[in-house]
From Swiss-Prot:
This is Cuticular glutathione peroxidase. Could inhibit the oxidative burst of leukocytes and neutralize the secondary products of lipid peroxidation, thus providing the resistance of these parasites to immune effector mechanisms and their persistence in the mammalian host. It may also be involved in the formation of cross-linking residues such as dityrosine, trityrosine and isotrityrosine identified in cuticular collagen. Highly cross-linked external cortex may also serve to protect the parasite from immune attack. Its EC number is 1.11.1.9. Belongs to the glutathione peroxidase family. Residues 1-19 form the signal peptide. InterPro entries: Glutathione_peroxidase (IPR000889), GPX_AS (IPR029759), GPX_CS (IPR029760), Thioredoxin-like_sf (IPR036249). Homotetramer. Keywords: Glycoprotein, Oxidoreductase, Peroxidase, Secreted, Signal. One of its GO terms (cellular component) is extracellular region. The keyword Transferase does not apply.
């Protein structure tokens, strides 16, 4: 195969991958789900940074956190463009966004940890995109299945699923499939200033951040 045909075939494959979305939903499911409040918090967990070091989420005490499982080659990837403006508008600096790359949905995050930031800057969303100082991108992890990260196991236990249907089996790169699984890339969990998960949002429940902003404001007003 010539180099030109090889490049073309890779481009076609990439377009097919990017075009894959999770299951379509009706408007009745776009309302965020409220989480069960318990004594356990996200501060009990550690996560891996891009350099391989571990970081305790207790370092985010007294912050409102938006936790997002992200992917570079997803139809929802352009939501990255909304993250920085939302953080810029958060004048008191209370809000932090924590992004966790995951490759479990149609293999839409194939990059290694050391490649992730370059992929975001030069490929998708591209155009020199770099994260705001309060946008933190961590190492890749699994959000579902046998090896789901303890943080995500906790979030799923505390917050009901956003939709009643998980999706198509061939698009989900994990086992076993659970009823409370993260549905697709860019699902979001909103955590209050005490580290308690409060709301869970479907990836489509976004609208350039306007669908989530009222709930962020609500948690920021809390003492």
């Amino acid at each position: 195969m010539s180099a030109q045909l090889l490049i073309l075939s890779h481009m076609v494959l990439l377009q097919l991958i990017v075009a894959q979305l999770g299951p379509k939903i009706g408007k009745q499911f776009l309302k965020p789900k409220q989480c069960e409040i318990t004594n356990q918090t996200v501060y009990d967990f550690q996560v891996q940074m891009l350099n391989g070091a571990q970081k305790s989420l207790a370092e985010y005490r007294n912050k409102v956190l938006l936790i997002v499982n992200v992917a570079t080659y997803c139809a929802y990837t352009m939501q990255y463009r909304d993250f920085n403006p939302i953080l810029e508008s958060n004048s008191n600096g209370t809000l932090n966004i924590l992004g966790f790359p995951c490759n479990q949905f149609y293999l839409q995050e194939p990059a290694e940890n050391h490649e992730l930031l370059s992929g975001l800057k030069y490929v998708r969303p591209g155009h020199g995109w770099e994260p705001h100082k309060n946008m933190h991108i961590f190492g890749k992890l699994e959000v579902n299945g046998e090896n789901d990260h303890p943080l995500y196991k906790f979030l799923k236990e505390r917050c009901p699923p956003t939709v009643p249907v998980i999706g198509k089996r061939h698009q989900l790169i994990y086992d076993p499939i659970g009823t409370n699984d993260v549905i697709w890339n860019f699902e979001k969990f909103l955590v209050d200033k005490k580290g308690r998960p409060r709301y869970r949002f479907h990836p489509e429940n976004w609208v350039q951040g306007t669908a989530v902003k009222p709930y962020i404001d609500e948690l920021e007003r809390e003492i």
